[in-house]
Amino acid sequence: MKKLQKGVRDILVVFALQVAWCKIIFFALFLLIGLECEPTSNITLSKFFLACVFAPVWEEIAFRYIPLTIAIRYFKKSFIQITIGSAIFFGYIHGSPINIMIQGVWGLMFSIIYIRNGLVYAIASHALWNFYCLTQ
């Protein structure tokens, strides 16, 4: 039960940090370059499944479970570099240069959850974040 409480607490803390970070970054972009966004509409079941189930499972396995498990077992001295590299690559696959920074930070946060609590909690945190983004 304590592990569940710790995992849920970590997910909520990371989620709060993500929302705050995102609001600060996008508010700054709105002010600096006049960036505007439109509310999301027409969320289909397939879009929901892709964003909130498939992507979190696949990305957490590909960017956290595989590289960090290998790093822990075989490359302990390079663990931090591998974690940062994985987070940067995670950001890179999400597109634009601004996404490399934003998603890279999320990758580091998901890595912390993975290391502290395990894969299921990292997937849950990632799914929660994607759900939040999908519904904004």
In which residue ranges do the predicted regions lie?
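Transmembrane helix-loop-helix hairpins at the membrane interface
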Residues: 45-136
